Amino acid sequence: MIRTFEMELGGRPFVVELGKVAELAQGSCMIKYGDTFVLVTACASKEPKEGLDFFPLSCDYEEKLYAVGKIPGGFIKRESRPSEKATLTARLIDRPIRPLFPKGYHNDVQVIATVLSVDQDCPPDISAMIGSSIALSVSNIPFMGPTASVSVGMIDGKYIVNPTSEQKELSELELIVSGTKDAVMMIEAGANELTEAQILDAIMFAHEEIKKIVTFIEHIVSEVGKPKSEVIVKETDSELLAEVVSFLDTKLANAIKTVDKTERNENIKAISAEALDYFEEKYEGRSKEVNTILSKQIKVETRKMITSEGIRPDNRKLDEIRPISSEVGILPRTHGTGLFTRGETQVLTVTTLGDLRDAQRIDGLGEEDEKRYMHHYNFPPYSVGETRFMRGPSRREIGHGALVERALKPMIPCKEDFPYAIRLVSEVLACNGSSSQASVCGSTLSLMDAGVPIKGMVAGIAMGLIKEEGQIAILSDIQGMEDALGDMDLKVAGTENGITALQMDIKIAGIDRNIMETALAQAKIGRTHILNKMKEAITSPRTELSAYAPQVTKLKVHPDKVREVIGAGGKVINKIIDETGVKINIENDGTIYIAAPDQESARVALEMIELIVKDPVVGEVYTGKVIKIMDFGAFVEILPGKEGLVHISNLAHERVAKVADVLAEGDLIEVKLMEINPQGKIGLSRKALLPKPEKEAPKKIE
């Protein structure tokens, strides 16, 4: 039976249709938001996967180009690997729902959102995120939701739910929030240097809208929801737990307090191996149970140390930042480099400048068709002392790259002020937590070293939270162990003036406004400290670009002159390119960008274009090239693409019988422009520039 439910969301109808399509999935719904249609399905395996210590959830966001009336570009005319946008949206779907499955539930779960039609004013990503919650909630899959999601913009200090395409262009904030009725679960934001208070108000505004959507979903579940499958979780043997805890005594706590990450891991590994050997001998065949208890005890012991004793694994204070060092200009042939080291985390970021034709072409569902500023993040296995296959960027690498890109985007100069394509690549050389935020810092240093006139320096910091038995500890600059065992991962990037990017994932309920306010305030103090440390390496962008960077010159001509610069079949522009070795990009408004390998090539190309667009002036003298000899005169090119006629009578003061007696094709001669007739034809004179012959004195008659 087909059931339809409707509510208003952001001033537009939001419709959920169930029972019409994809009925064999355990949960499915069609979301209709304006003219945006998204089909979301949820399926789970019947049996759990044996031997797993994690929850095997996969979320996919399928972009179909027919949704916007496009045929895929390139040789293969079908959708293939997910776009960057699709990967990021899949992560947005995954992050808020993953913590809401029962502990110990290890069945395969797959959520697929397929975009079938797109209305640019009704975001398909938000539709997919809400749809995933509905599909899971109405299914028999044990999901402890529902969750809901909204996008928030800010124009003139006013917050807007799910802003339209036009409103996004004006907005100073791009915020996506997911949560339950009781708590915020996930935040993703980009902002134009907004204050902590403005960001926090926007999050709370979003949560009020989320509560309305969750109530709407709860009504749908009460009408059509299926009974949930029972999850059978094996309880830990309390006697075995007590024995393991007694065996560990203080040895585990001492190992956790080791400052060096590698040494700490080795110490914990040695103690765990000792415990496994002891209990394998005592209780043969129970190694798996003992190993599970050991993993839990590492978490319990670490969290207790932090909340009760205020001691972190590397003996730092809760708000203490690890030692920082910054360097620039360390690679001689690149356009800009920044090496940022914070504790045992180290990132090298390299900037490459290109002409505007190097901008990334985007063949997606949105209105954006190219991107001139790009950031890519690479996390090789050696950065954590491991081995694995390297088969292109992972979802995590794409997500971290996008976060860093968003953090710096408000600081990147517009193409009118800096007509270059900009690519940043952050190579994580060593990692013990906060590598994405180290990439923010390294990218700032690299851009400044490259001479990109950024509007301000940006630094990033990762914050953590431990909430244990009523005690709360907020941690600045978390390392890997604290990230894995904590309750919140909050990444904040910004300038001295405000926040430019924020990402938050919460693993527990009960994170209220006060906790977030404290965390953001503590992050600001840490961010300011990091910025001051970065200034020890470089304080402002270099005034000159690298000698190995392309030299881009901008010229503005009248739009009517564009055809003259291009010439018939591209003849004129290709001649300039061939003679100078430059690249030329011309826009419809008459803006011309010249990218040259050196200043001299740029100068020559610029002069050639200026001559082409220059209008001939009556009375001016030109040095021209004879391009054609006729019986009645010679055609002379005085400016590129502009030629005039020197009539035979204007070649010399004396009578000229044949033009060829005076001129030959290819000769360079000086001519004066005498007239431009109504048809635009140019009349030239060589004679006007020649001295008049002296008249012979009359002979005396004797």
UniProtKB/Swiss-Prot annotation:
InterPro entries: ExoRNase_PH_dom1, ExoRNase_PH_dom2, ExoRNase_PH_dom2_sf, KH_dom, KH_dom_type_1, KH_dom_type_1_sf, NA-bd_OB-fold, PNPase. PROSITE patterns: KH_TYPE_1, S1. Belongs to the polyribonucleotide nucleotidyltransferase family. It is found in: Cytoplasm. Mg(2+) binds at residues 483, 489. One of its GO terms (cellular component) is cytosol. It is an enzyme of class 2 (transferase). It comes from Alkaliphilus metalliredigens (strain QYMF). The keyword Protease does not apply. GO terms for molecular function: 3'-5'-RNA exonuclease activity; magnesium ion binding; polyribonucleotide nucleotidyltransferase activity; RNA binding. Its EC number is 2.7.7.8. GO terms for biological process: mRNA catabolic process; RNA processing. Keywords: Cytoplasm, Magnesium, Metal-binding, Nucleotidyltransferase, RNA-binding, Transferase. HAMAP family: PNPase. It comes from the Bacteria. It catalyses: RNA(n+1) + phosphate = RNA(n) + a ribonucleoside 5'-diphosphate. Involved in mRNA degradation. Catalyzes the phosphorolysis of single-stranded polyribonucleotides processively in the 3'- to 5'-direction. Its cofactor is Mg(2+). This is Polyribonucleotide nucleotidyltransferase 2. Residues 619-687 form the S1 motif domain. SUPFAM superfamilies: Eukaryotic type KH-domain (KH-domain type I) (SSF54791), Nucleic acid-binding proteins (SSF50249), Polynucleotide phosphorylase/guanosine pentaphosphate synthase (PNPase/GPSI), domain 3 (SSF46915), Ribonuclease PH domain 2-like (SSF55666), Ribosomal protein S5 domain 2-like (SSF54211). Residues 550-609 form the KH domain.
